[in-house]
């Protein structure tokens, strides 16, 4: 029996207005519909994104596009680098969780 290709889900997260780490985590919490107990730090982000990535592996793969990231990168500096590392870690471990960057 031939394997059928799963449809892809997509999500776009606009980071163009993000100027602080707190605003970044608030934007992520809203975009991904994280639970109320999301504590707005990198460990919590990794845990919540891993949960989403596992679901993407079991159901439809997910492509997340971060729009306006250049402004957030300038505003957040090394905090943005740490945020991006978390995303890279999750997407490397779960190939059905794809991250794209759009200026």
Give residue spans per PLM region:
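Positively charged, polar, low-complexity stretches
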Residues: 2-103
């Amino acid at each position: 029996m031939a394997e059928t290709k799963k449809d892809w889900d997509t999500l776009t997260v606009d980071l163009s207005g993000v100027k602080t780490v707190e605003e970044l985590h608030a934007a992520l919490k809203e975009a991904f519909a994280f639970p109320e107990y999301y504590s707005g730090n990198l460990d919590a982000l990794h845990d919540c994104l891993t949960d989403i990535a596992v679901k993407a592996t079991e159901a439809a793969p997910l492509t997340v596009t971060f729009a306006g990231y250049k402004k957030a990168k300038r505003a957040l500096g090394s905090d943005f680098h740490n945020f991006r590392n978390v995303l890279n870690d999750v997407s490397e471990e779960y190939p059905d969780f794809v991250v794209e960057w759009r200026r």
